[in-house]
A protein has these predicted regions:
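Conserved beta-strand
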Residues: 12-15, 24-36, 64, 347-365, ...
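Conserved beta-strand-loop-alpha-helix hinge in the C-terminal portion
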Residues: 84-85, 89, 215-243, 529-539
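Conserved H-loop
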Residues: 202-208, 229, 515-520
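ABC ATPase nucleotide-binding domain signature region
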Residues: 37-38, 50-111, 366-378, 382-435, ...
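ABC-family P-loop ATPase nucleotide-binding domains
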Residues: 81-149, 409-478, 487
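Coupling and communication elements adjacent to P-loop NTPase active sites across diverse families
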Residues: 2-18, 96-153, 236-354
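Hydrophobic anchor residue at the start of the ABC signature
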Residues: 157, 467, 486, 497
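Catalytic Walker B motif of ABC-type/P-loop ATPase nucleotide-binding domains
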Residues: 168-172, 177, 185, 407, ...
Length: 539
């Protein structure tokens, strides 16, 4: 992806952002952002969306300032519209079509020609762009609400790519795109000659970025190279951080041993001095003064040691903050294991109400790991719900022989007003409380999280909680049905969930457009949608 070095499009000077509570979300940030492609990563809640809005000029920084040289087009993650909003209005180009219509009717206004400067061919370009994106012909009067979630994303992206903007600000653009939609976006970015800052956890997309920015609460750090290079640099940083922590701990242990020796020696000298003073032929006031000084020396040394200990403890804490926690291993109950050859699921001439195509005859035997593939709208979610009995089939039957659990991207089976512990208790977990707390701690779900309402916890924590609830209930889960589980997770949470799911000993049926996530699950089969029906492939 060749993008030449250019002058800065944005300059950030001591930019900070505060929440309504007065707490600082991030900053101060200092950065020069050139007109090239750049990925933006960071944990959920750190402020990636807020940073994009600051760069777009939609929000103002709490302090500092942003020099904005480039014209921008911003595509938000959430798309808000009124029910009667047309496509032309939604994309901000209604003025073009209104002016063209007036001119065609011979009712043009004085400023129409000026307003249309550079936009005369926009209808043709929009039409070509929409067709290339698989959206059909562009109809300016079509209601935007008639588009699906993935179609809305592609429509917004089409508008951005066809705009006169120098710089694109894209917030999780692949979240609702299927494989074909993602391939289209990757191609558009390959051909884009302007700059772009793209907040994303899509590793395939980030692999195409020549630069990665990582946002933390304290800084915006720049890494040259794509996502693979970023991972390597972060691993080197973590190796250095772990070495620094080990050195700090060793230094504290060595210093404590030295201080103990100094303390013991000081006490011996003080005791010897006191005994010597008692033998001296000196005035009583001198004796009192000398004894006071001898007794004070251990106290003075103790204060010095306390200050040194505080400095060493602070150094360890600072070093520990730079070390990231290892991804957890998900504990599973023995009952979750599925023996090879055991029938898990059998479909007999199954047809779905959503997509009444050729009947599906299929079965899952043993711990099969199956990817459910197909474009948006083909009926993948409908199939999962039909397998669980949440939705009746059009015809045919489904026979489920094991306990199954379903997790969708919204974790709709969770009551967000309840805590993790409350959910586990409702599931009648067989784990004793001590074991339960220990296993939750292994998932980085400590005492500070397990009693809080899920509504105040991040998406990654909620997903780990949901997995704990379905895997640690008394009736062990042997089949997991996962519907885009990583859609709203940051990279760190996605990696953690990958590792946890890789250990699951049962069967699995998963819907995801994240190829890296699917590879990490070590899939055995693929159930793929075709126009003529579903087909099964061994991987």
């Amino acid at each position: 992806m060749a993008h030449c070095a250019r002058s800065p499009s944005f300059l950030l000077h001591q930019v900070t952002c505060q929440l309504a509570t007065g707490d600082t979300l991030f900053g101060p940030l200092n950065l020069s952002l050139e007109g090239t492609l750049c990925g933006l990563v960071g944990r959920n809640g750190v402020g990636k969306t807020r940073l994009l809005r600051l760069l777009a000029g939609l929000d103002s920084p709490s302090s500092g300032h942003i020099e904005r040289v480039a014209s921008v087009s911003y595509v938000a993650q959430q798309h808000v519209m009124f029910p009667d909003t047309t496509l032309a209005e939604w994309l901000g180009v209604e003025f073009v079509f209104s002016a063209l219509a007036r001119l065609e009717r011979g009712e043009g206004r004085a400023d129409d020609l000026e307003r249309l400067d550079g936009f005369w061919d926009l209808p043709e370009r929009l039409n070509a762009g929409f067709q290339a994106a698989g959206l059909g012909e562009f109809s300016p009067g079509r209601l935007a609400s008639s588009l699906s979630g993935g179609e809305r994303v592609k429509a917004q992206l089409c508008g951005a790519f066809l705009s006169d903007a120098d710089f694109l600000l894209l917030d999780e653009p692949t979240n609702h795109l299927d494989r074909q939609g993602r391939a289209w976006l990757y191609q558009q970015l390959e051909q884009w000659r302007g700059g772009a800052l793209i907040a994303s956890h899509d590793r395939e997309l980030l692999t195409q970025m020549p630069r990665i920015l990582e946002l933390t609460s304290a800084a915006l750090r720049s890494y040259g190279g794509n996502y693979a290079d970023y991972q390597q640099q972060r691993e080197l940083e973590q190796q250095a951080a772990r070495a620094a922590l080990e050195h700090a701990v060793t230094e504290r242990r060595r210093t404590r041993a030295r201080m103990q020796k100094e303390h013991d020696a000081c006490r011996r000298r003080s005791a010897q001095t006191l005994r010597t003073i008692d033998t001296l032929n000196i005035a009583s006031f001198e004796r009192v003064a000398w004894k006071g000084a001898a007794k004070e020396r251990p106290g003075t040394l103790k204060r010095q040691h306390r200050e040194q200990s505080s400095i060493l403890n602070d150094a360890i804490e600072q070093a520990r903050e730079r070390v990231e926690e290892d991804n957890p291993v998900m504990f599973t109950l023995p009952g979750s294991q599925v023996a090879a050859g055991k029938q898990v699921l059998e479909l007999d001439a199954l047809r779905l109400t959503h997509s009444p195509m050729a009947a599906l005859d299929w079965r899952i035997d043993g711990p099969m790991r199956v990817a459910l593939r197909g474009p948006n709208g083909c009926g993948k979610t409908t199939l999962l719900k039909t397998l669980l009995g949440l939705q009746p089939p059009l015809s045919g039957s489904c026979r489920l022989s094991v306990n199954a659990a379903y997790l969708d991207q919204h974790l709709s089976q969770l009551d967000l007003s309840l805590s993790i512990m409350a959910h586990l208790n409702l599931g009648d977990t067989p784990l004793e409380e001590g074991v339960l707390r220990s296993q939750l701690a292994q998932l980085q779900l400590g005492a500070d999280k397990v009693h809080l309402p899920l509504s105040v916890l991040s998406g990654g924590v909620r997903l780990k909680a949901a997995l704990a609830c379905v895997l640690w209930r008394r009736e062990a889960t042997q089949l997991l049905l996962l519907d885009e589980p990583t859609n709203h997770l940051d990279l760190a949470s996605t990696l953690a969930i990958e590792k946890a799911l890789a250990q699951f000993p049962g069967a699995m049926l998963v819907v995801s457009h994240d190829e890296a996530f699917l590879r990490a699950l070590k899939l055995t089969h693929c159930l793929a949608w075709r126009e003529e029906g579903w087909s099964v492939e061994r991987l």
